[in-house]
């Protein structure tokens, strides 16, 4: 019965993946992209065209579907090489933010079945800004936050991941009696995901890479699904640290993950611990 319900939920959710709809930084609200009451209006279909298109702090994504190849440059920010958007096209604006402050990202719906970790990375851009910066696969990214499996000592229906329960109502009705528990964020009351900009960072321009890794099909090779997106910050503050190979674990995208990594090739429906992929979370040096 459980496998039938999971299959139903997964099939129904194929066209119902979520994305970051808006970001709040230093009290300023940023639409990512423009909100629309038209449910067919996916994030890559901004209704404003030409000279009327509003400028963004977020880099464009081509589709609300996943990146499934860990060796693809599209893993970086959700671009689509096939569509001519390598990695992801830089945004024209930067959001002003203070080191040590909290940033809130509000997702749209998210399928209950698509359980997995949520991770956030940063990379320092050139002194001229991020608006023309394409990192390639250089190891410049440092992880600032991650969440994975919150519990693993319960039976499957009570399993708690960082992505459970932002599902649409029709998915919820299928799974409701399985009592999938809600997580600290991504709830039906649309609690945002939050990360904190490291307080020690040297002022400058930074690219933030935020992602969900959905593991519902990850028992098979290339079954993991990656949902990355990027936004651009201009960080101020009194910090002086520039993360480098001497004080942080830096990775590239692609390059940070391996398809055979036990955290990528993983049976999410089985109980047991889960080690979040990628480097250790960067910590500011002790004062």
Curated annotation (Swiss-Prot):
Lignocellulose is the most abundant polymeric composite on Earth and is a recalcitrant but promising renewable substrate for industrial biotechnology applications. Together with cellobiose dehydrogenases (CDHs) an enzymatic system capable of oxidative cellulose cleavage is formed, which increases the efficiency of cellulases and put LPMOs at focus of biofuel research. It is found in: Secreted. O2 binds at residues 216, 225. Its EC number is 1.14.99.56. It comes from Podospora anserina (strain S / ATCC MYA-4624 / DSM 980 / FGSC 10383). One of its GO terms (molecular function) is metal ion binding. It holds the Pfam family AA9. Keywords: Carbohydrate metabolism, Cellulose degradation, Copper, Disulfide bond, Glycoprotein, Metal-binding, Monooxygenase, Oxidoreductase, Polysaccharide degradation, Secreted, Signal. Glycans are attached at residue 22. Belongs to the polysaccharide monooxygenase AA9 family. One of its GO terms (cellular component) is extracellular region. This is AA9 family lytic polysaccharide monooxygenase C. InterPro entries: AA9, AA9_LPMO. Residues 1-16 form the signal peptide. GO terms for biological process: cellulose catabolic process. The lineage of its organism: Eukaryota, Fungi, Dikarya, Ascomycota, Pezizomycotina. Its main location: secreted. It catalyses: [(1->4)-beta-D-glucosyl]n+m + reduced acceptor + O2 = 4-dehydro-beta-D-glucosyl-[(1->4)-beta-D-glucosyl]n-1 + [(1->4)-beta-D-glucosyl]m + acceptor + H2O. Disulfide bonds join 77-230, 200-284. Binds 1 copper ion per subunit. Its cofactor is Cu(2+). The keyword Transmembrane does not apply.
């Amino acid at each position: 019965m459980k496998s039938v319900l999971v299959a139903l939920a997964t099939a129904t959710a194929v066209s119902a993946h979520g994305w970051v709809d808006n970001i709040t930084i230093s009290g300023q609200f940023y639409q990512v992209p423009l909100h629309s009451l038209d449910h067919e209006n996916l994030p890559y279909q901004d209704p404003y065209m030409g000279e009327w298109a509003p400028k963004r702090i977020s880099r464009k994504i081509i589709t609300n579907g996943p990146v499934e190849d860990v060796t693809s440059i599209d893993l970086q920010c959700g671009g689509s090489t096939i569509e001519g958007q390598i990695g992801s096209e830089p945004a024209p604006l930067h959001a002003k933010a203070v080191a040590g402050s909290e940033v809130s990202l509000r997702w749209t719906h998210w399928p209950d079945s698509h359980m997995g970790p949520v991770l956030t990375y940063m990379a320092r851009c050139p002194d001229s800004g991020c608006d023309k910066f394409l990192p390639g696969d250089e190891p410049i990214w440092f992880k600032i936050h991650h969440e994975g499996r919150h519990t693993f000592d319960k039976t499957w229906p009570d399993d708690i991941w960082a992505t459970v329960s932002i599902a649409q109502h029709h998915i919820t009705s299928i799974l409701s009696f399985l009592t999938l528990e809600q997580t600290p964020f991504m709830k039906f009351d649309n609690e945002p995901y939050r990360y904190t900009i490291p307080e020690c960072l040297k002022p400058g321009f930074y690219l933030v890479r935020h992602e969900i890794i959905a593991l519902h099909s990850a028992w098979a090779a290339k079954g993991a699904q990656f949902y990355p997106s990027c936004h651009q910050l201009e960080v101020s503050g009194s910090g002086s640290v520039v993360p480098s190979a001497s004080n942080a674990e830096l990775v590239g995208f692609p390059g940070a993950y391996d398809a055979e990594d036990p955290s990528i090739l993983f049976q999410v429906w089985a109980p047991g611990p889960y080690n979040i992929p990628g480097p250790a979370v960067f910590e500011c040096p002790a004062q």
